[in-house]
Each structure stands twice: as structure tokens, then as C-alpha cells.
Amino acid sequence: IISSHSNKAHDGFLGHSYVGEWVNIGAGTSNSDLKNTYGTVKMTLGNIEVDTKLNKIGCFISDHVKTSIGCFIYTGKRIGVSSHIHGYITEDVPSFTIYAKSLTGKSFELHKNSAMETQKRIMERRNITQTSNDKDLLSRIFKMTQDERYMFGVLKTDFSM
């Protein structure tokens, strides 16, 4: 399922997955939807591991996510709101995270204002005006997910490679 205003124009496999709104899937981004063991997919929800009892589940990509060229997302992984992902995604990614662990060994917090500016730019490309409600929603999600970023070890410093 690919929601409105999302872009998957390039090569790459995207199977048995959910993609939120305003997502850009970079060229060559692919996901796995089947474990090498052919076993059922287990996902983490909160602090609880849940057996889905399904052997085919792709990824779950939240609104405003951007994937860089050549991302590989492992089976059943969740990508949080406004995250930017790079390289191999082997674990769930919190909202507002620049995930570059396979490249730098680290993840960085995406500044809220940067997320809002990116939202504005992508909406303008579709002749849609960003509203105060759009910005307020991102602000609220940013605040609601700050503990998740802390627990994940996301660095509150500028991203660099």
C-alpha cells in the first residue's frame, strides 16, 4: 500500500509493505518481505516482541520518511515519522531520526525545524501550501517520540558523514 503524495518512481523491490503519505523512496531502495529461514516474522511493538504468525511482511514506512539511494530495509522493520534512512536498515527506526548506522555506526536526531522545512518544500512541489496544522502535527509527534529516540541512542548533534 502506498499512500497519497508518496513517490516510488525508481527501481527497487517494495513488497508486502505499507508506505505513509509524503514519502520519497530513493532509487534502488528495496525491502525484504521474507526471512531467510522462511519462519514467521516477529515485530517489536513497544517493548514486546510479537509473532505475526505470517511469513511475508515487508516494512512499515511512516509519513514524511525519505530513503536515500540504495537503502535495504529488513523484513518487518518500522520507520518512524520524518526519518531519513541510509544504507542497511536492520532495526526499527524512531521518528525524526537520520539513520546511518551502517555507514557511520550512529543515528542522529532530525531537527524539528528541518523536518518542517522539508515538509514545506515537498508540499510546494505539489502546489500544496503547508498549514499551521501540518506544522503543529509534526511538532506534537516530535515531542511524543522524544523518549523513543533517547532509548534508541539517537544523538542530538548534527549529522555528518
Q: Which residue stretches match the model-derived regions?
A:
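Glycine-rich hexapeptide-repeat left-handed beta-helix
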Residues: 1-156
